[in-house]
Amino acid sequence: NEFNTRNDLLATNFLLNTKNLNFNVMTATTCQNLQFDKANAFRNFKNDSLGYFLVNRWKNYKRWWTSIDPQQKKWIMWDLSIIEAIIHPEWATKKIFKTPIDNLQRDIKVYTSIDSSMMKKDFWEHYNKLN
């Protein structure tokens, strides 16, 4: 019952009902543990096109799904959490769950924990190698 699945129930059901699909799910509950602090991130973003893009995105993106943190002092790194989990599976734990009762009954893998410290460290190391 997460907002990503509620935004596109047809796509979610399609994936859940696809036989033999190796389906790995990074939940909002799990990836919320990988958050960047605004002050720290802004200090570390470079004065280049990527740095400007990231700062602008942070400042101007409207978080329509929540009213928590109106100053946007923290940012959950949704996409980075799944990318890091794929690249470094040792930094993530997956458990097997059954699909919901209304869907094709099969096992899917759900990320239940991530090593957010290692993921942050890896991001900044790679970011700092750019340019």
Could you describe each region identified by the protein language model?
Residues 1-131:
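N-terminal acidic, glycine/proline-rich low-complexity segments
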